[in-house]
Amino acid sequence: MLWDSNQVYQAADAKNYETYIPTEKHIKSFEELQKINPDVIGWIRVNDTNINYPLLQTDDDDTYMNTDAEGKYSLSGAIFLHCGNKPDFSDFNNIIYGHHMEKHMMFGDIGEFTKEQYFNEHPYGNLFFDGKNHGIEFYALMQVDAYNETIFNVCPDTSEEKQAYLLEIIDNALYKRCLLYTSPSP
């Protein structure tokens, strides 16, 4: 079966989900999307990019590789949080997946961050979950192998694992910003 690539890109267009974009004052449309698909846990936006999508999570990371936010089959899939992460983003390391696509669809704009000026001009984004906006500050850019166990360790438990994670970023980032990290109180 041949797929028309335009159909794939149309399915991946963030404009398909504009009616569901939540704000703290208006979440009704977002709640409607959650009724369509209860796996919708939030929304991710990277300021001044085309990354502006519902965020999903299920107990199987393969599900949203080819399923959209409304639960329909789609080659472009959806943006989703690793199944091992807590949906309240309280883990030390939260991993969000999505296809890197052409035409600035899904995580297609991530490639732009490899340009230093673009990285410097796009430091912020937003995660909407639990009915609130939670700002994101992007502090480093790395290109890593998908099998890098330090970076893709969903829940580093020990202070040594957390230290190794941070050192891996500091030592291997293409670009980075100063960021003050304080360990949460036990």
Predicted regions and their residues:
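N-terminal membrane-targeting segments
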Residues: 1-20
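Conserved small/polar residues in nucleotide/adenosyl-binding loops
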Residues: 181-186
